[in-house]
A protein has these predicted regions:
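N- and C-terminal low-complexity/disordered segments
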Residues: 1-193
Length: 193
């Protein structure tokens, strides 16, 4: 891994300092709750940044849910991590046609079937869903996943992407969050469909 680049390393196990930081979030932030789902990777820059996929619940009368990437920073020679940023990657909306966010690593059977159907015959990249983000009812049902996408080439650059499956016609839409690429130092976010 080169200095400043993200190293993709998806896991449902969190480094100890990151797990402690996650546990303290609900005490530190008023008006929202966070449910961490997956560790996405790390970046070495001014210490070590750690990216975590989570569900954010805004505590209002409607309890809106969003998919977010939490970035924690671990400074050298410190015993804890600090929350550096909260990046909204999918905004939930309780209105008709809005995205019903329910971030989980337990992918619902109907969503998995839609993804499998859309990936049938798909070539060029290996797409592995590690989390279900939610669904949207428009013309048919669209499902959104967090996936590891690895091109089928020599020396592939793995990417963490949001993948939207349009189940009515079995098509896919990709939005990259970040990758292993040497020069990729930014975490992309704030997507709206």
């Amino acid at each position: 891994m080169s200095l400043g680049a993200w190293e993709v390393k998806v896991s449902t196990n969190f480094p100890q300092k990151v797990a402690t930081g996650i546990a303290q979030l609900d005490e530190q932030i008023i008006g929202a709750e966070y449910d961490a789902v997956a560790y996405l990777g790390s970046q070495v820059v001014n210490g070590t940044n750690h990216a975590v996929l989570a569900q954010q619940t805004i505590l209002t009368g409607r309890d809106t849910k969003n998919a977010v990437v939490l970035v924690f920073n671990e400074k050298p020679k410190t015993i804890e991590v600090a929350l550096a940023s909260i990046n909204t990657i999918v905004k939930g909306n309780n209105e008709p046609g809005g995205i019903d966010v329910n971030v989980t690593t337990e992918i619902p059977a109907e969503a998995k079937a839609a993804l499998d159907a859309a990936l049938k015959g798909f070539v060029g990249s290996k797409v592995e869903a590690f989390a279900y983000i939610g669904k949207q009812v428009t013309k048919g049902i669209d499902y959104i996943f967090a996936c590891e996408v690895t091109p089928v080439v020599q020396d592939p650059v793995k990417t963490i992407s949001l993948v939207k499956v349009h189940s009515i016609d079995n098509t896919l839409e990709f939005k990259a969050l970040f990758s292993d690429e040497k020069n990729n130092t930014k975490l992309g976010y704030a997507f709206t469909w």
